[in-house]
From Swiss-Prot:
This is Cathepsin D. Gene3D superfamilies: Acid Proteases. Residues 76-393 form the Peptidase A1 domain. Glycans are attached at N131. Monomer. The lineage of its organism: Eukaryota, Metazoa, Chordata, Craniata, Vertebrata. Inhibited by pepstatin.
Length: 396
């Protein structure tokens, strides 16, 4: 019996004390910030395909560039440090991309987005190493560009040595001006990393900085409580979920891509009838899918299209909306109307918006569904690089 107690204590210690915890704060998305300012987001993005971007540029031996999503709806960020002594930055921990980039002290004085955010200064770091390789991420509104540098990267209690990252000297359009975060820390696979830069978590694994090669996200969907969530490096925390994790294999090691068996909207509509692919993406607030299917879904729940690609729902009808169910790995993950409808303040009034949006992701990467924060907020999610799988458990 004493041995059993010791064993249980060891297991609990791994799930709670051996992991590194990064608090996440929730902020108002770029889309909502621009809308609050009276700017027409659709006009700003006209011809840009909603700031879609390519991650991973072609070379003689590189994969085809893949169009994914934007950061217009990102809502959670946390802090990291770069250099010695540490320079602090806020970043979106994004499982839908693989690069770390931050604004550079050398950005142009005409780059307003850069001027409004924290900037990395290699001259103030004793561990900085010049690299100089040019990098660029193609957004619809232009190219975010700069050059690579190397320095130590501090995340919680972990110090990743010799991390390559992008110093951004040019940020496109107005979108990043309104961003509450300084940069992006990608947590997807190396395959989609621009310039073949090893992602931060890959460096953690190779330097044996984590107990287990997994990380997990808890996203708090209650806007009145703090913290906004937590990123756990090296494990999971039982206080954030009930029951057991159900795991599904990663079908393509680029994004955190999984197979979805189907979707249903109450008894009214079935989507993804022959199965489809989805990616699990912490950098996207909404759930997105092929536009034609999402339009059918919005019609089924009685949503009214707005000019910005969003859909509005009568707040009085939210409690009676049909349940949306996602069938993944033989399990059904359901969202009620209260869970997939977003309540926003606009002009002093509360409006209800659908948490789903159409997004065209063409072949060869797409079509894809994106399970963003609307989904992850209800299902605590673990990303397992050891076994290349994703696990879901009901959030507490």
């Amino acid at each position: 019996m004493k041995f059993l107690y010791l064993f249980l204590f060891a297991v609990f210690a791994w799930t709670s004390d051996a992991i590194v915890r990064i608090p996440l704060k929730k902020f108002r998305s770029i889309r909502r910030t621009l809308s609050d300012s009276g700017l027409n987001v659709e006009q700003l993005l006209a011809g840009t395909n909603s700031l879609q971007h390519n991650q991973g540029f072609p070379s003689s031996n590189a994969p085809t560039p893949e169009t994914l999503k934007n950061y217009m709806d990102a809502q959670y960020y946390g802090e990291i440090g770069l250099g010695t002594p540490v320079q602090m930055f806020t970043v979106v921990f994004d499982t839908g991309s693989s690069n770390l980039w931050l604004p550079s002290i050398h950005c142009s004085f005409t780059d307003i987005a850069c001027l409004l955010h924290h900037k990395y200064n290699g001259a103030k770091s004793s561990t900085y190493v010049k690299n100089g390789t040019e990098f660029a991420i193609q957004y619809g509104s232009g190219s975010l560009s700069g050059y690579l540098s190397q320095d130590s990267c501090t995340i919680g209690d972990i110090v990743v040595e010799k991390q390559l990252f992008g110093e951004a000297i040019k940020q496109p359009g107005v979108a990043f001006i309104a961003a509450k975060f300084d940069g992006i820390l990608g947590m997807a696979y190396p395959r989609i990393s621009v310039d073949g830069v090893p992602p931060v978590f890959d460096m953690m694994m190779s330097q044996k900085k984590v107990e287990q090669n997994v990380f997990s996200f808890y996203l708090n969907r209650n806007p009145d409580t703090e913290p906004g969530g937590e990123l756990l490096l090296g494990g999971t925390d039982p206080k954030y979920y009930t029951g057991d994790f159900n795991y599904v294999p990663v079908t393509r090691q680029a994004y955190w891509q999984i197979h979805m068996d189907g979707m249903s909207i109450g008894s009214q509509l079935t989507l993804c009838k022959d199965g489809c692919e989805a990616i699990v993406d912490t950098g996207t607030s909404l759930i997105t899918g092929p536009p034609a299917e999402v339009r059918a879904l919005q019609k089924a729940i009685g949503a009214i299209p707005l000019i910005q690609g969003e859909y509005m729902i009568d707040c009085k009808k939210v409690p009676t909306l049909p349940t949306i169910s996602f069938n993944v790995g033989g399990k059904t993950y359901s969202l009620t109307g209260e869970q997939y409808v977003l309540k926003e303040s606009q002009g002093g009034k509360t409006i209800c918006l659908s948490g789903l949006m159409g997004l065209e992701i063409p072949p060869p990467a797409g079509p894809l569904w994106i399970l963003g924060d609307v989904f992850i907020g209800q299902y605590y999610t673990v990303f397992d690089r050891e076994s290349n799988r994703v696990g879901f458990a009901k959030s507490t």
